[in-house]
């Protein structure tokens, strides 16, 4: 059995780019009401917010978690480790769907850090992500949320003028993203191929010439590299890429939590943010 899936309509999801629906507002309210009070309280304090985000990144393996906490303590973060230890059981017990919303809740508090504190926070965040020698989908999504909503706040950055005004030179990079999303969301070859075809169909006739890449040519580092190129496109082209990814995700009419989080991360990275997808979970299906 695979991850629980939700109903998914790409067009409705992307309509949310410009308007948050009543359903989404109600869902956000429900998430806040169901959130552990200890985590909710921590999110409203800069120190607690840092500890909470770091705790979300701790290894699920007991030995790995202990090693990470010890390393942080040895590097002068004893108070932080103590707070992380207090929050850990609350983090472990939380609904996975509330993890990114919890990070969102912490953003205003994290913006209260000084530039030096933010730099220290960023370094620790990166160390925790890399400490297990691999990056999972949640870590990647969290990293993109932090980059968009925090780094841009502390580090003045002006978006480079678009150098791509047509889709043609972007197709190889779009191919990497669409292939990656197709593989991540589906285990069966036929379903993966269908998802890829639904995605490239949104790119017009030129897109139909693209072929599905093997997963070792479209993993997260390669997808991240593709984003760097796609960010040089006009807003309309970037939104078109996100539209293609939404159709890749929704090829089977449903979406898993990891697919929804990854889509949100890439939409943030391309400066085409979309609100979290909410719908009624349906029966768990093989993915």
Locate the predicted segments by residue.
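Small-residue-enriched hydrophobic alpha-helices in membranes
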Residues: 1-130, 138-287
């Amino acid at each position: 059995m695979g991850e629980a899936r939700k109903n998914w309509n790409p067009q409705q999801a992307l309509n949310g780019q410009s308007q948050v629906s009543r359903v989404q507002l109600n869902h956000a309210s429900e998430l806040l009401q169901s959130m552990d009070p200890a985590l909710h309280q921590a999110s409203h304090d800069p120190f607690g917010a840092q500890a909470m985000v770091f705790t979300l990144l701790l290894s699920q393996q007991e030995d790995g978690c202990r090693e990470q906490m010890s390393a942080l303590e040895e590097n002068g973060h004893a108070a932080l480790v103590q707070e992380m230890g207090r929050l850990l059981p609350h983090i472990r017990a939380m609904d996975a769907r509330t993890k990114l919303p919890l990070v969102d809740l912490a953003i205003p508090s994290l913006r209260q850090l000084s530039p030096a504190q933010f730099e220290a926070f960023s370094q620790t965040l990166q160390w925790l992500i890399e400490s297990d020698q691999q990056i999972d989908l949640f870590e990647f999504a969290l990293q993109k949320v932090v980059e968009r909503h925090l780094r841009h706040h502390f580090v003045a950055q002006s978006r480079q003028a678009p150098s791509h005004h047509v889709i043609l030179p972007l197709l190889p990079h779009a191919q990497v993203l669409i292939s990656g999303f197709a593989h991540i969301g589906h285990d069966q070859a036929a379903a993966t191929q269908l998802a890829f075809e639904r995605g490239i169909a949104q790119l017009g006739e030129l897109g139909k010439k693209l072929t599905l890449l093997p997963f070792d040519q479209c993993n997260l580092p390669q997808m991240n590299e593709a984003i760097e190129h796609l960010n040089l496109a006009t807003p309309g082209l970037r939104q078109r890429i996100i539209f293609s990814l939404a159709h890749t995700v929704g090829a089977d009419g449903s979406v898993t939590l990891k697919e929804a989080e990854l889509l949100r991360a890439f939409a943030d990275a391309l400066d085409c943010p979309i609100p979290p997808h909410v719908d009624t979970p349906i029966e768990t299906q093989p993915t």
